Structure formats: C-alpha cells, structure tokens
C-alpha cells in the first residue's frame, strides 16, 4: 500500500489527481496541497511513498520541491505531473520515478503506481 502526496497550485487539477488516486486500491492514503510550503510542513511529520508534483508553481517550482522532499524523506518516489512537456529534460536531473502529462489519465497513473510497487517489492527482496 502506498501513501501519496499530491502538490499542484491549480485546485481543480489537484482535486482531479487526488480523486484518481483514491480510485486506486493500492493507495492507502492521499494528501493534497496547493502550495509547496504546506506540503513540506506536512512531510516533516508524515512518511510518504510517492509524491505527484506539478513543476510550474508560483511559490516554489516542483523541481526545487522534489529536491527538498528527497532531503526530508529520501525514500519518497517523485513523479512529475505537468502540462508542459518541455520541462521533462530538467526534471530528469532529479531522477524521478516517472513523468505524467496533464490531463492525467487513470491508466497512466495506475501504471506509475504499479511501477512504484514493483520498486518496493524489489527492495524488500534484496
């Protein structure tokens, strides 16, 4: 089971992504924030397996947020969710587990969840 963090400054999109997460049985908890700072505060006290991050946000961009998440919670897998495919090259420097383009399709999100679960399974077997 995965604990998922969603961060996007667009509230409608944030709600859509969180709703998609809640439909996936392998996700036990979904927390969503429209500001990176709020997400970081929450992460200080709560573990997270997967962070779904928008890249283009006003208070802190998703790339910076990802770096901070990796410092606070090193085991958290990062998946960037954005409407701007040109950010893909910059995002790969963070070594994300994946990259989803908006609007996010249920099957694409499920594919990312399955991939993260396979990584967790591999870690346990090692």
Regions found by a protein language model. Give the residues of each.
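Short amphipathic alpha-helix used as the core "switch/output" element in two-component signaling
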Residues: 41, 63-74
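Acidic, metal-coordinating helix/loop segments flanking the phosphotransfer/catalytic sites
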Residues: 32-50
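Conserved acidic segment of CheY-like receiver
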Residues: 2-13, 17-21, 51
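Receiver (REC) domain active-site loop signature in two-component systems and cognate sites
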Residues: 55-57
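A short, hydrophobic beta-strand element within the central beta-sheet of small alpha/beta folds
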Residues: 75-85
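Acidic catalytic/metal-coordinating carboxylates
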Residues: 35, 61-64
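C-terminal output helix
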Residues: 104-115
């Amino acid at each position: 089971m995965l604990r998922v963090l969603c961060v996007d400054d667009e509230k409608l999109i944030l709600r859509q992504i969180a709703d998609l997460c809640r439909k996936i049985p392998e996700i036990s908890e979904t927390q969503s924030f429209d500001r990176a700072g709020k997400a970081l505060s929450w992460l200080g006290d709560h573990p997270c397996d997967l962070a779904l991050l928008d890249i283009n946000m006003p208070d802190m961009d998703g790339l910076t947020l990802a770096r901070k998440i990796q410092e606070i919670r090193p085991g958290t897998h990062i998946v960037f969710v954005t409407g701007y495919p040109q950010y893909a090259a910059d995002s790969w420097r963070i070594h994300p587990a994946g990259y989803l383009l908006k609007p996010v399709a249920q099957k694409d999100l499920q594919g990312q969840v399955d991939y993260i679960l396979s990584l967790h399974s591999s870690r346990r077997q090692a």
